[in-house]
Structure formats: C-alpha cells, structure tokens
Amino acid sequence: MGKVYKGQDWRLDLTSDIDLSSVETTEIQALKPDSTIESYNGEVIDQQNGTVRHDFNPTELDQAGDWIFWIYAKLTNGKEYYGEPYEKHIYNRGE
C-alpha cells in the first residue's frame, strides 16, 4: 500500500470473513497512536466477500504513528461483528 502521510487523503478497503448482505451499520474503527478510538463511516463494496471502504480526508488522519483499523458491522438480526485488525504506520511529511 505504500506510505501514507498525516493530513492526506487515503482510501482504505478492509475485508472480513462475514457476509455483509444483511448489515444495518458498517464502520471502520481505528485505534489511533494516542490510544483514542474513532469510528468512520464504512461503505460496503462487496457484500459476499465482506469488503468495507472508507475514504479518509486530511482532517481524519490527524496523527502520525501506528494505527490499528478494523471493521465493525451490526447486522439486521442485532448481532455485532468486529473484523481482524489491520495495522498501518502513518508518517509525518518528510519521513
């Protein structure tokens, strides 16, 4: 995926092992370098393969350091699902 820098646009696609055809809510959640957790709108782009996308804008990638991302999905039957973590280092410009 190459380097991603603080304050840039970035598209993240995450894939889970769950069929998202009966999803009520999808998010990409993130543990940021300062240990806060944020939630971002997730767009389901492949229901059968469980792929969710978020296009980060420059204000969302507001910290350099190690981030951990995962899918959160709430299904129409009320069950909640948390996907496998994906780790990504976000760099300061010039690094």
Feature names for model-found ranges:
Residues 1-95:
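Contiguous segments within soluble domain cores/interaction surfaces
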